[in-house]
């Protein structure tokens, strides 16, 4: 039975022939899948059913039926999407999410449920207009018919699969890989065909959830009522600092307090906004959905597009975390002395600039170990040594001042800056440092612009203090910094290419589009940056009105 919703009525009026053609095809396709399932005799013998060319050829299905005429677009196409669809079909099995989301998740089905699962799986990918590929006999295979899929999948115990769709609003095909496994069942245990993070051999008496392998597609971790040792039992928040140089009130204050001399600390390119925050939020919703709350620290009005009614978003003005004596401020060093004073912030948080963008799926484990130890992404080379020098970069002088404190405290010298990427931070450590170095914190807090006597709290001091006190470890995650004095077009295009290929091994954890040195005057830079942002993150997030 077909229900004519508003979209279908509009299509019927606009193009009657297309309406009846596609509606008929939808019905035939659904009927064909049901008929095929009914005619299937047993798992040891593939019944050869005569299926029309249009119905049996998966590639033809995708080509002949346009997504905009038949199905609503998919906002987020990933492994969770297909699990949800299979649960809607009442399929039975378990799924395993890897600790590293750039690895393949697994979908595990009992051999005794194989026939029923494949019926529902094929019906799902057909009704959702998805393209299926899988690795078979060492090669990636594009199956041409339902019979071919049945024959292949009944001959193996596990297979790597790729599902893709052009139904997203992105300019490219969306796709993901997962592992499909068929488990053998004994009266006492279930045996998985490959090793996994929990257990390959599952003793039935150890299963705490009696619905496992009996109802729905459930998380394999439900074998216990306790959290797994690698799971994080704490919330993680996200903090942005943000400024808009076009804000009228900000301009008046900047004009009033700007010193007579010019430096990179006072360059307007440092405060330029090309809506990077919008794209940064899109990247986090797409690739970092584990975040509990997002705090945006600013002395400007919120951008018009931001939905402050979203319960995940909290706008924080400088006066909420900084004393009146320090305001107004135009120094990121000053603001960063006070992030741990944000009301309601979790002890564990990630500090990010609005020009840091996530490029691939991440989870809590990319930023913290499950025991709370922070993961740092320090640069591979050292830069910090010597005394503060007038005319040297402000970030470097701030790191030098921090280095002096670290040498006195730990009797070790440090040289490595943190990469331009999201930073894993803990408020308890920041409070501890503020108490230990009150004079240095207070002096930096009251500098209107970056100054020679600043300490770089989040840029240097925190990371090495946490590392040397045993509360942080270095991570090997790759990150990418793009500046106007780089071959920026090549760098940006490379990230786009790797993203389209879903090449997570080569993709950096994040990319930083770093303005500065009057980069806003470089027209080619501006064009390429905007093109990059709109290509990588074209879909609005739930944080937008």
Curated annotation (Swiss-Prot):
Top-level taxon of the source organism: Bacteria
EC numbers: 2.7.-.-
Pfam families per record: Stealth_CR1, Stealth_CR2, Stealth_CR3, Stealth_CR4
GO-annotated biological processes: polysaccharide biosynthetic process
A molecular-function term among this protein's GO annotations: transferase activity, transferring phosphorus-containing groups
Keyword set, alphabetical order: Exopolysaccharide synthesis, Transferase
Keyword Transferase set for record: yes
Miscellaneous section: Stealth proteins are part of a protein family that is conserved from bacteria to higher eukaryotes. Family members were first identified in microbes as proteins that help pathogens to elude the host innate immune system. Microbial stealth proteins are involved in the biosynthesis of exopolysaccharides. Stealth proteins are predicted to function as hexose-1-phosphoryltransferases.
Family stated for the protein in its record: Belongs to the stealth family.
Role according to the record: May be the polymerase that links individual UDP-N-acetyl-D-mannosamine monomers. In serotype A the capsule is composed of repeated units of (alpha 1-6)-linked N-acetyl-D-mannosamine-1-phosphate.
Name of this chain's protein: Capsular polysaccharide phosphotransferase SacB
Species for this entry: Neisseria meningitidis serogroup A
């Amino acid at each position: 039975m077909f229900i004519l919703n508003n979209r279908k009525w509009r299509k019927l009026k606009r193009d009657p022939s297309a309406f009846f053609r596609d509606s008929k095809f939808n019905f035939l396709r659904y009927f064909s899948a049901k008929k095929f399932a009914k005619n299937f005799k047993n798992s040891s013998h593939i019944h050869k059913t005569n299926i029309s060319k249009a119905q049996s050829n998966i590639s033809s299905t995708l080509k002949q039926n346009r997504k905009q005429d038949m199905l609503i677009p998919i906002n987020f196409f990933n492994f969770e999407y297909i699990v949800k669809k299979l649960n809607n079909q009442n399929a039975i099995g378990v799924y395993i999410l890897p600790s590293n989301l750039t690895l393949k998740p697994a979908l595990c089905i009992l051999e005794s449920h194989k026939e029923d699962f494949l019926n529902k799986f094929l019906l799902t990918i057909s009704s959702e207009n998805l393209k299926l590929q899988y690795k078979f006999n060492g090669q990636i295979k594009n199956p041409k018919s339902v019979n071919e899929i049945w024959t292949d999948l009944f001959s193996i115990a596990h297979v790597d699969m790729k599902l893709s769709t052009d139904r997203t609003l992105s300019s490219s095909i969306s796709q993901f890989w997962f592992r499909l496994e068929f488990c053998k069942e004994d009266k006492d245990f279930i045996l998985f065909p490959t090793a996994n993070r929990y257990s390959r051999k599952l003793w039935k008496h150890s299963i705490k959830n009696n619905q496992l392998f009996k109802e729905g597609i459930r998380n394999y971790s439900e074998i216990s009522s306790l959290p797994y040792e690698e799971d994080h039992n704490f919330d993680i928040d996200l903090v942005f600092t943000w400024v808009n140089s076009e804000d009228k009130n900000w301009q008046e204050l900047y004009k009033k307090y700007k010193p007579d001399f010019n430096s990179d600390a006072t360059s307007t390119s440092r405060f330029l906004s090309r809506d990077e925050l919008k794209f940064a939020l899109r990247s986090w919703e797409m690739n970092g959905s584990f975040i509990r709350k997002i705090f945006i620290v600013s002395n400007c009005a919120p951008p018009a597009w931001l939905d402050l009614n979203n319960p995940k978003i909290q706008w924080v003005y400088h006066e909420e975390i900084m004393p009146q004596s320090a305001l107004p401020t135009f120094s990121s060093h000053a603001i960063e002395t006070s992030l741990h004073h944000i009301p309601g912030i979790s002890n564990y948080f990630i500090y990010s600039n609005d020009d840091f963008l996530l490029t691939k799926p991440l989870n809590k484990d990319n930023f913290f170990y499950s025991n709370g130890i922070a993961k740092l992404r320090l640069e591979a080379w050292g830069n910090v040594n010597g005394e503060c020098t007038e005319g040297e970069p402000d970030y470097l002088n701030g790191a030098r001042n921090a280095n002096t404190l670290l040498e006195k405290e730990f009797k070790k010298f440090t040289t490595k800056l943190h990469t331009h990427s999201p930073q894993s931070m803990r408020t308890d450590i920041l409070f501890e440092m503020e108490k230990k170095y009150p004079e240095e914190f207070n002096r930096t807090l009251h500098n209107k612009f970056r100054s020679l006597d600043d300490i770089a709290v989040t840029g240097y001091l925190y990371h090495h203090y946490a590392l040397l006190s045993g509360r942080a470890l270095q991570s090997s995650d790759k990150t990418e910094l793009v500046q106007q004095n780089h071959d920026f077009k090549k760098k940006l295009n490379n990230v786009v290419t790797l993203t389209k290929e879903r090449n997570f091994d080569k993709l950096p954890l994040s990319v930083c589009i770093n303005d500065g040195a009057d980069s806003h005057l470089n027209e080619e830079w501006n064009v390429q940056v905007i093109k990059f942002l709109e290509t990588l993150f074209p879909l609005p997030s739930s944080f937008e009105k």
